[in-house]
Each structure stands twice: as C-alpha cells, then as structure tokens.
A protein has these predicted regions:
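Residues that define the transmembrane beta-barrel architecture of outer-membrane proteins
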Residues: 59-67, 96-101, 148-152, 159, ...
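Beta-barrel outer-membrane channel/assembly domains of diderm bacteria
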Residues: 19-114, 156-158, 373, 385, ...
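Extracellular loop and loop/strand-boundary signature of outer-membrane beta-barrel proteins
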Residues: 51-57, 88-91, 138-142, 172-178, ...
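Transmembrane beta-strand segments that form the barrel wall of outer-membrane beta-barrel proteins
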Residues: 79-90, 101, 136-140, 165-173, ...
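Outer-membrane beta-barrel strand-turn architecture
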Residues: 24, 72-77, 99, 108-111, ...
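Outer-membrane beta-barrel "beta-signal"
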Residues: 343, 381, 386-388, 400-414
Length: 414
C-alpha cells in the first residue's frame, strides 16, 4: 500500500507538470530537505522512571536522519502538494511515509470562490499560539517550518476590497466521535480592515464539542510596532483525564477521553522591529483546555508513589507500565500548562537569520529555550539549532522524554 501511495502521488504531480504548455510557467516545484536530529533523553519524568525500573519499557528517543521531498503543482481550478518522507532512527526500522498535503479543486465566480478537497485553512493571529485556528489547528513552535497537512473541506469565500467572509465544512465524511482537528465541524470567519487594524470574528460548531466563538485583531501601530490579540470561548473541549479510581497500580491505562465545559483561550502579544531588522516578539496566553495546576500536582504525586512501590514489594513490571501510562498527560492539550509567556528575538542579516526564543510557564518555572541559525541562498538553505528544557526538577517541561534536541538541515529548492 505504501508503494502504491508513493506511485500515485508521483503520477498525479508529474502528469500535471507534463500538461503545461511550453510558454507557461512551470507547474511543478518543490524542495528536498535532509535533516539530522540528535536527542538527549531526560533523566526525569515518568518515562525515564519506567525505563529505570524495567529497561526497555519506554525506549529513549534516538538520533536519526530524515529525507523529505515536498512537491507542489497547480493548474486552472486545482492545486496539489505532497510530502514524501523517509526516516531512519537508531534502533528503529526505516520508515517511509507519503501524503497529499493539499489536493483541492477551486472555482472562482467573481467575488466568490468555492473549494472542495484537502486544503490548508489557517486562521487567526499570533505566533506561538492561536486560539481561533479552528479549522487547521496547526502545531506551533516547531523546530523547522514544514508544509502542514490540510483538512478535508467544503468551503465558500466572499471577498471585497476591505472585507472577507468564509464558510467551511471541515471533515464532512468523518465520524462524529473524532477529536481535535479530525472532528467534523462547521466554521465561519469574517475579516474587516479598518485603517491599520485587521479585525477577525470566528464561529465553530463541532459535531460533539458544540459551539465556540471568538475574535481577534492585529494593529500595525507604527513602522516599528505591531500589536495583536485573540480570544475564544468554547462550549466544550476534548481533553484527557485520569480515572479517580486509579489510586495505585491498575491493569489498564487509567487515562481516558473527557470533555471540559466552557473553557476559555486568550492571547495578547506584540512585535517591535528596529532599523537594523532586529525583532522582538512577546506573547502571553491562557489555555483553559490544558490540564489544571491541581491535575498536574496530582499527576506528580502519583508518579512519586508509583516509583516507590517496587521497594514495597509491588511487581516491577506493573509499576513500570503504570508510569509509562502517565505520559498520556502530555497529549491532553496543545499546551501543557494553562498560563504561558513567550519571547522571541530574530534578526535579518541579509542571508543570515539568527533566532532565540523562550517559552516560560509561571505555574512551575518550567522553561523551553531554542536557538537557531538560518542561511538562505538562491536555491539552497542551511540551518541548525538546539532546543532544551530547563527549570525546577518537578516542572512539567522537565518531565518530557527529551531533555535536549539539536538539528542540522539542508534544503534545495527546485
């Protein structure tokens, strides 16, 4: 099946490129990227504790290389993009993946545009977090910017000089019980420009999470200063929670899907840029869909109890397995903590672009620090960087399975 998928993607995009006329602009473009990742496993956290009790319970993240090809093609009334990827990692067989990021048919009818297919629909303002990204629900703050995978949509848009309206039916064929970005939903956005301010309004009706509504603005206050904010209220939100009966060793994973009532998400931020192209971005946000401070405290207490149980005669394998299940908490929301502060410094030095950013979580003092350097040529790019966790030993960020990750990548554009 994997080879058939690869062949189908290559056939569709190659045929599209071959169909162009001699005097037309090339319809096929893309890039080829080779990336090396080096990871240092954390010595703290439930997975580290599980592996210490019973080696092999939770495999440590290994070093590896990834070869990624991104292909783009478009024609009159359609657009397609695809990703082909091969990944090698120490101790893991080579993995090959292929997918269409976008495969969409479009129709322009004056001020209206209609779309059907797999499409990237990215909404909202903000850099590190976007409360109103209700369709795409893109993962933010990745080490390297890659092409996201679109969602199945039926979409209608209306544009004029200073405003736009969008209506989307996302995941129309998926089951109602799907969660997160896979949930079937109806969504709408209105955009209005007034001078230097962009105003946004959003609404969403999920198959099982119900309604949500939000608003955002981005204001270019001067040549040097930009301010933005976004907020969203949700009727319900998908999350994970541990069973209240899980007070000791259990035989099955105690973490299960749950629903949060009436959470709120909000972000405020701004960017300052000087004449030397040095930019400082600062953002603060609240994510009511993340686990609460009380839940994280109970989580840490359970980790400590499970670690001590083998010394009291409990089966080592059972304690290790229960500790490994505790890592489910990392997937409860796109943010680990509800309150977050973010600072990013970048500078554009012609071909060179250094960047430094810090995510800080006031609830426990956890920190996530990233440093990167990018060089851009005409068709070539080279970049490298490192990301590391810091803070008190009991901070949630310090419990993640990877303590430090470094990477090097080279990209050729064609």
């Amino acid at each position: 099946m994997r080879h058939l998928t690869l062949a189908a993607i290559a056939l569709v995009l190659t045929a599209a490129a071959a169909a162009q006329t001699d005097d037309a602009a090339p319809l096929l473009s893309g890039n080829l990227r080779l990336q090396w990742d080096q990871r240092q496993a954390s010595s703290t956290g439930p997975l580290a504790a599980a592996d210490k009790l019973l080696p092999g319970t939770a495999a440590a993240p290994g070093d590896g290389a990834t070869l990624t090809t991104e292909l783009h093609s478009r024609g009159m009334g359609w657009a397609a993009s695809a990703t082909l990827q091969q990944q090698t990692q120490q101790g893991v067989p080579v993995r090959s993946r292929a997918r269409f990021n976008e495969l969409v048919a479009t129709h322009d009818a004056g001020a209206w545009q209609f779309s059907a297919g797999k499409k990237i629909v990215a909404w909202d303002v903000g850099y590190a977090f976007r409360p109103n990204d209700v369709v795409q629900q893109e993962v933010r703050r990745t080490l390297i910017t890659t092409l996201d995978e679109g969602r199945p949509v039926l979409m209608a848009e209306h544009f004029d000089a200073d405003s736009a309206w969008s209506w989307v039916w996302v995941n129309p064929t998926k089951e109602r019980a799907q969660t997160g970005a896979q949930e079937p939903a109806l969504a709408a956005r209105v955009y209005q420009r007034q001078g230097g301010v962009d105003w946004h309004g959003f609404a969403r009706l999920g198959a099982h999470t119900g309604s949500s509504a939000g608003g955002a603005f981005a204001w270019v206050a001067s040549d040097a200063v930009e301010l933005h904010a976004s907020a969203r209220w949700l009727e319900r939100a998908d999350s994970l929670a541990i069973s209240p009966l899980a007070t000791g060793l259990v035989h099955t994973d105690p973490w299960a899907a749950t629903s949060l009532a009436h959470p709120v998400q909000a972000l405020i931020g701004g960017t300052w840029t000087n004449e030397n192209q040095l930019s400082v971005l600062a953002e603060a946000w609240w994510d009511g869909t993340a686990l609460s401070d009380r839940q994280w405290t109970a989580w840490g207490t359970r980790n400590a109890v499970l670690t001590r149980l083998p010394g009291l005669g409990a089966p080592v394998a059972a304690a290790a397995g229960n500790l490994a299940w505790q890592a489910d908490a990392f997937n409860a929301s796109s943010n680990l903590r509800r309150s977050n502060l973010y600072l990013r410094l970048t500078q554009d030095l012609d071909a060179w672009q250094p960047a430094l950013d810090l995510l800080y979580q006031p609830a426990d003092g956890g920190r996530l620090l990233s440093a990167a350097l990018l060089w851009k040529g005409d068709r070539m790019q080279a970049q490298g960087g490192v990301r590391t966790t810091g803070g008190p030993r009991n901070a949630v960020l310090m419990q993640l399975p990877t303590r430090r990750q470094a990477y090097l990548a080279g990209t050729w554009t064609f």
